[in-house]
Amino acid sequence: MQAASLAFHPPALHTSPSYFSSKLPHHLNYSLFSHTPPTSTLSLTQTLSRKSICQPRAVGKYVREDYLVKKLSAKEIQELIKGERNVPLIIDFYATWCGPCILMAQELEMLAVEYENNALIVKVDTDDEYEFARDMQVRGLPTLYFISPDSSKDAIRTEGLIPIQMMRDIINNDL
């Protein structure tokens, strides 16, 4: 009697371009099974110009003396909130190690120039003022509070990086 020989042969992998990859632009048409890197249609000058756009513009420390948006303590912020104001107050809760906070700082500086006499923009370092940030229910960074000079209006709270146009809309329409 002869023993039956059982051999397992895995199915062959299909390496020809699939329907979906043939619909991709030719510089994105890349098979997972090929050993050649994808080709790019970008020229060297386009690649270099994209890199220069993405380079960080800020040099030096995060908070500088010449910034319009000033870093305040918890006590100073509480005095501003309770005090008499005729302009909206925007409070930025940030951390120096937070990438989105650094991007938001640049946008807030632009807003401070734009709304120089029409809004007061300040910032609080959550590492320095941990208890105050906790009391203000700051859970994610950056967190902004928009506080109207009219005490009958509720404060508006945002969390995360938001576009500068959204900040303008909140200042112009909701405060």
Swiss-Prot record:
PROSITE patterns cross-referenced by the UniProt entry: THIOREDOXIN_2 (PS51352)
Presequence range in chain numbering: 1-73
Annotated site, Deprotonates C-terminal active site Cys, chain positions: D92
Disulfide-linked positions: C98-C101
Compartment(s) where it occurs, according to its Swiss-Prot or TrEMBL record: Plastid, Chloroplast
Pfam families: Thioredoxin
Keywords for the protein's UniProt record, in alphabetical order: Chloroplast, Disulfide bond, Electron transport, Oxidoreductase, Plastid, Redox-active center, Transit peptide, Transport
InterPro entries cross-referenced by the UniProt entry: CITRX, Thioredoxin-like_sf, Thioredoxin_domain
Protein's name according to its UniProt entry: Thioredoxin-like protein CITRX, chloroplastic
Species per Swiss-Prot/TrEMBL record: Solanum tuberosum (Potato)
